[in-house]
A protein has these predicted regions:
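Surface segments flanking catalytic/ligand-binding clefts of nucleic-acid enzymes
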Residues: 2, 6, 23-24, 223-371
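Short gly/ser-rich loop at a beta-strand->alpha-helix junction or flexible surface loop bordering the NTP-binding
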Residues: 1-242, 369-371
């Protein structure tokens, strides 16, 4: 039901409205909620239950951003702005982040109950009855994202009261850019598009509050872009801790990383004292040239971080089935070994079980010294 990294069709959210016959569609949509067929993402914005249930968490987050934009004129910031700018995140954020010039609105706003007035267990039962072929719907599937409204970011040399006065007088306006309605791959956006903070400000404001690994995932991607320009926003880093955290993460970031898993791998490799690898090196073999995620030329070791997508998602497999992909990978490994390279593979499990990663690298001749 949605355009994702798997190439399936985008979600189209349904907005309740007054019909040509003078009847408002909300009554019909609420009736579909009562039968377990629809969920309410935001007030007046609906989606077929099965589409929401089958969407992965990252896609649900994007659907919620779109629904929020359809119902309120929001300027998205921090993690939400990064998503709109196409920057990967290590994990799905817990809330939608948006600015407000009204201090009274600067708080977390609970989302609507996705099942409307229908009790949750009753909704689950009705969905199961109307979708016997679908995977079971669970309570966790019906968790929605709140909207966290934040006062505008400000330079550290301007106090909050001064900044509020500037907003009231019109001498300062919230920084923003306009993004197209197609900014989110998971969902067809509102016709007017989205309002979001500039990428440089969003990256700086979000990354300075993230863990080091989360920040590197963001900043690797930001460094690969030519439209980020975070330097003009450096005065917006409010505390010395944020400034130090930003400098460390920005200094470590590398535009050569091409996925969140590669960025996370770079952090873990550094933490286990592995020699710094070369990123995206092209290795020539008898059957062709291969670009490797990580290379250690002196040790003749190549590293590849594999997610499930590499074997199952069409944009990576070019339509081949998993067995064919595995066969290609076998030939690739053999060709690399014939040129004197050892290939080490790892995925999410090994990044979270560092002892296993250390063993794999050690067997290939690398000597990380800590776990």
């Amino acid at each position: 039901m949605f355009t994702t990294r798997t190439g399936t069709q985008r979600v189209d959210l349904i907005r309740s409205s007054l019909q040509e016959n003078g009847v408002h569609s909300s009554a019909h949509l609420i009736g579909r909620i009562s039968r377990g067929e629809m969920v309410r993402v935001r007030r007046g914005v609906y989606l077929p239950t099965q589409a929401w249930a089958e969407a992965p968490p990252w896609a649900r987050y994007r659907i919620a951003i779109c629904a929020a934009a359809m119902t309120q004129d929001l300027i998205f910031c921090r993690d939400s702005a990064l998503v709109l700018h196409g920057i990967p995140l290590l994990s799905t954020p817990p809330a939608i982040f948006a600015r407000t010039a009204n201090p009274g609105e600067a708080k977390t706003h609970a989302p609507p109950q996705m099942t409307g007035r229908v009790p949750l267990q009753q909704f689950l039962r009705r969905y199961s009855e109307s979708h016997p072929e679908a995977a079971p719907l669970r309570t966790a599937h019906l968790s929605n994202f709140p909207t966290k409204r934040l006062e505008p970011a400000r330079p550290k040399n301007i106090s909050r009261p001064e900044h509020r006065a500037q907003l009231r007088s019109g001498t300062f306006s919230i920084p923003e850019v306009r993004l197209t309605s197609g900014a989110l791959e998971a969902v067809a956006g509102p016709a007017q598009g989205y309002r979001a903070e500039p990428l440089g400000l969003a990256a700086l404001d979000a990354a300075s509050r993230m863990s080091f690994t989360e920040a590197v995932v963001v900043l690797d991607a930001v460094k690969a872009r030519d439209d980020a320009a975070p330097v003009p926003w450096l005065p917006y880093l409010g505390t010395k801790r944020q400034q130090a955290h930003w400098r460390r993460a920005w200094g470590f970031a590398d535009a050569g990383a091409e996925s969140a898993l590669e960025s996370e791998s770079r952090v873990v490799l550094a933490q286990i004292s592995c020699p710094a690898p070369t990123l995206q090196k092209v290795v020539r073999t008898s059957i062709g040239d291969f670009r490797m995620d990580f290379c250690w030329e002196r040790e003749r070791v190549a590293g590849e971080v594999d997610g499930r997508a590499k074997y199952f998602e069409p944009q990576y497999t070019n339509g081949a089935d998993p067995a064919e992909v595995h066969y290609r990978e076998k030939r690739r490994r053999e060709a690399l070994e014939a040129e004197g390279w050892q290939l080490v593979r790892w995925g999410k499990a090994e990044l979270r079980n560092r002892q296993e990663l250390v063993k794999r690298l050690g067997r290939a001749g690398l000597r990380p010294i800590s776990t």
